[in-house]
Amino acid sequence: MALPEFSMRQLLEAGVHFGHQSHRWNPKMADYIFGARNNIHIIDLAQTVPLLHRALQAVSDTVAKGGRILFVGTKRQAQDGVADAAKRSAQYFVNSRWLGGTLTNWKTISGSIKRLRHLDEVLSSGDANAYTKKERLTLQRERDKLDRSLGGIKDMGGLPDLIFVIDTNKEDIAIQEAQRLNIPVAAIVDTNCDPKGITYLVPGNDDAGRAISLYCDLIARAAIDGISRAQGDSGIDIGASVQPVQEELPAAAQPAGFQGLAGPRGVADDLKKLTGVSGEIEKKFNDLGIFHYWQLAEFDHETAHKIGEEVGLPSRADGWVAQAKALTAEAE
């Protein structure tokens, strides 16, 4: 794996260079503005390119050191891209309303996350039958409300090590909380925004859907590169197995979509290297016949989600697949 590459042409095609109307500008962004056309400020992509590369390097370095990245984008056009990118790169996200104190009052937020986990457990088990239809509906509504706000961070387990923000004006509370806790901020900063306090500033259009999709994709790939680097630094050699192939489980006993094994093929991979996988979760993987990264790397979304449900962490499934692919590619 390597840091994701991009070109100025890609930025142009995505509309990254289009700022806001010239009368809506923030004078503090003057250094990053190339000029104006039809009363629309044009962002200087000659500066955006190296600054975006710097932000990608920061994301990769943070993840390579075992850090967590929090994607923040609550505006409508950013919600899906932020969630997809975070899941694909085994990171975390907030794409609904930012709850004040999400970072600075983590203890209270953790309590809400515990409540969300409890509701998930109750509603997905037979315990739900003990409630009346009206009570179940009330619990479901509470669960859905919590999931919208906290679903993307319920597995984070602590404060992030870096946050990536789309639209610094809209996410100003998130940025203030990060600054108060000395958490680095990488952000897309448009011509109507204040660049002050942004650790890794990237001048660019924060409204166009194509531009936002490009940013999210690049940040996700940088995070995956960091995962790959972390595994490489740990000295894991996935291709070192020289022992005979073990007998596979009968096909009828295997969930569709992956190859279950009766035992590891040679030395089993340390599945605890995957984000959120404890010794207990690793044992559940093994009970399902999963011992190696290459098995996880072959999962499609549906199969990954089913396996995630089997081991009790369905929200992490896509992230595990991304990590497994990175590890497998590193070994090759």
Swiss-Prot record:
Superkingdom of the source species: Bacteria
SUPFAM superfamilies: Ribosomal protein S2
Alphabetized Gene3D superfamilies for the sequence: Glucose-6-phosphate isomerase like protein, domain 1, Helix hairpin bin
Gene Ontology cellular-component annotations: cytosolic small ribosomal subunit
Matches recorded under Pfam families: Ribosomal_S2 (PF00318)
Example GO molecular function: structural constituent of ribosome
Ranges in coiled-coil conformation: none
Entry keyword set: Ribonucleoprotein, Ribosomal protein
GO BP terms, alphabetized: translation
PANTHER family: 30S RIBOSOMAL PROTEIN S2 PROKARYOTIC AND ORGANELLAR, SMALL RIBOSOMAL SUBUNIT PROTEIN US2M
Annotated family: Belongs to the universal ribosomal protein uS2 family.
Protein name: Small ribosomal subunit protein uS2
Native species: Nitrobacter hamburgensis (strain DSM 10229 / NCIMB 13809 / X14)
Lineage: Bacteria, Pseudomonadati, Pseudomonadota, Alphaproteobacteria, Hyphomicrobiales
